[in-house]
UniProtKB/Swiss-Prot annotation:
Transmembrane segments: none annotated. GO terms for biological process: cell division; cytoplasmic microtubule organization; gamma-tubulin complex localization to mitotic spindle pole body; meiotic cell cycle; microtubule nucleation; microtubule nucleation by interphase microtubule organizing center; mitotic cell cycle; spindle assembly. This is Spindle pole body component alp16. The keyword Acetylation does not apply. Component of the gamma tubule complex that is required for the regulation of both interphase microtubules and mitotic bipolar spindles. Disulfide bonds: none annotated. One of its GO terms (molecular function) is gamma-tubulin binding. One of its GO terms (cellular component) is gamma-tubulin ring complex. It comes from Schizosaccharomyces pombe (strain 972 / ATCC 24843). InterPro entries: GCP (IPR007259). It is found in: Cytoplasm, Cytoskeleton, Microtubule organizing center, Spindle pole body. Its main location: cytoplasm.
Amino acid sequence: MDGIMKNDLLWFGNHVFDLTPNSFDSDFVEQLSKFEGKEGLKRKLFDSSEYFQNFSFQVNDDLLGKDVILDISNQQLTPAVPGCETSSNSKLISASKEITSERKRAKSSVSPSYLTDSSPSDLSVENKVLLTCPSWDGENFKNLEARSPFISEAPSRVYDYFLHNQDWSPKPLFSALQVYPLATIFNCVAGLPQGFESTVFPWNKTSSTFELDPTISVSGMSDECFASIVQKFSAIGGLIKKALNEFSLYKTNISFYLSNFIVNGVLQYRKEFQRWLRLYEFRRFGLIGLSNFVNSFSSFFELISHFLIKSAQNLKGDSLLDFLFDYARSCQNTISYPIALQCLIYCSNPYFKRLELALKVSCAYGHIDSSLFLSLPRFFPSELCVSIEQCIQFLSLIREQKEIFNKNNKEFINPLNIRFAYSFNDINQACVIEERCNFSSLSFGNLEQTSVNNDSEEFETLLAKMNMTPDFNDNLLQLKFTDDVRNVCPLNLNVCCCIAEPIQSFILSFLRSTYKVLKNDFQVFDLLNFFHSTFLFQNYEFSDNVISLLKSRRLDKSDRNELAEDLNSDDRYNFISRLKKFIFMEKEKNGLSRSLSKSITFTLDSASVSEFEDVYPDLQFQCQVIGALRILFTDNSLNYYSKTFSYVLHLFQAQSDFESSVELKDRSIVTKTTIMSWSKYQGTKESLFQFLSIYIPECMLPFTKLLKSIYSPDCPTNIQNSAIKNAASVHEQCTKAIYQKVKELFDTMKLWESSIKVS
């Protein structure tokens, strides 16, 4: 017959029904037996019977597949009834959709070929049974007709084990089978790539992997295909579970944002995944379609895998930021670039916000977060790092002028908007935002009150915000899981347009504002003109006063050693004090008040210099520049200035010595040598004054013009900060030329002194 009932099991076609007392009425079974050999009537009976309305194996459109999948074990199993144990290795996965096509049923007798191919009863049973699968290729039974009304297209040994058992009873096998609807299997498989464990695929905490049962098969799909999909899904699910566990803790601010990006990305991926499951049913696409959908997130999985490997290195701070940038750069021109750039943007924005705030606080308050500026990311251009270094150096020099900051802080506030852009449109929007951006409207305080002493609480608040404590409520924007890179902004353009240019503009604007203030308060150009062209000694009256002072200390002294001895006495202090007084009086004559003249100081230092070890070691002229002007003076420039005017001072000393020696001589005796010496002395003296009044201004002219061109109101706005560095370099060249010229004069003077001694 087409349906065989044995031990409360009904075998009909490719369905197996458990006929427990609560399942079917005996009248129904009796009625069913009357239709033996009449397939169509029997099917109508099944379709119209009220007993099948609540039966678990009725046709359900939500379930995929149409056949029975069996997992058989040859061990002695116990029935799966309440109170009895059931082996977890044996499963029956059943789908209820009937086969619509009519199929010729073979007689219940076993064909001779199966009798010859049958295996002995003591052999192990094939542990996989795949019913009505046209692609079954095991045991060379591919695309064969069903050989039994009970099981379709089963391997021969399994078939023989069922039919040639002692009493033809499958009860010892099938009574212990666990029944899983096919939808349950699909749900478990769909949960794998989301990182969800299930009873079918449990999570092994020891090995941190999903446990896969190789005995599970799906009809309509080869074992190899199903196994590959399950392995692929389990690998993705394991990656997600590891990522959620690994990135649950963070050690630095940037690592927090990286963790937040990955965790929120996983949540968005799961949301998109479940949305696809709702919109596209399995019966339309199946596991193959689901696998293709998961492939669209391959770049996100690659990013997770990449950072899971590198997380063991415990990257921190800027090293992690550089690592994010390097990863995004390595992904350029690939489908992984969009998601890598989004990760870089999200994780780097807090750093750029902190950099903006640090520059803002530095300019408005004079506070400098050196740790932030000394550890700039490697992807910053070298020119940008130099500009920032010069700006910080400039700030460190002028932050002592608190009165200037408190009075003119609004002049130092400039717009700044630095962060990476995702697309070309974002760059255009950033330019618009930068034009209308005003730092005074931001949330970190009212910048009109910038006195550190009066607003200490506000200043401390700003410093606390510079730490950029992570916000746990920070929600990640909707990620773009796309492989379209046509409108995605390249990294080089990102760094140039979104990082370098805004910072360069900010620094240049700040320097312009600073020099504008200095021009109004310090009369910077008058000071520079005075400093570069005269340096005190161009004025004849001042020079005569200095020479007279030196001569007064030389009178009644026989030689230079006595002068040195006298300078080491108490009179030395009076001498230096009077010389400083002359210097200060000269500066006041040039319109420099007592407070503003502190920017440039001239001191006498007793430290010996190699050039002057034998000539007046106690008279060393030291040039110092304090404040905003210091950025225009390199260390070499200051050294050249000190040496230059030390030479000048010693030339004056030599002149005073010669004049004193002439005055001490007997005037009645005028020799030819004395006349010649006096003539040479006058020539050297004239050369010295020409050097001070003509050579120095002409030599400093290139630097003076360059400085005025940079900071004049008509200066173009696109001048980069490198112009300031160039001006300082030109300044150094000018001072070097001046130093070489005065050294020639000094050498000439020494030759002249030698000639006098010889004569």
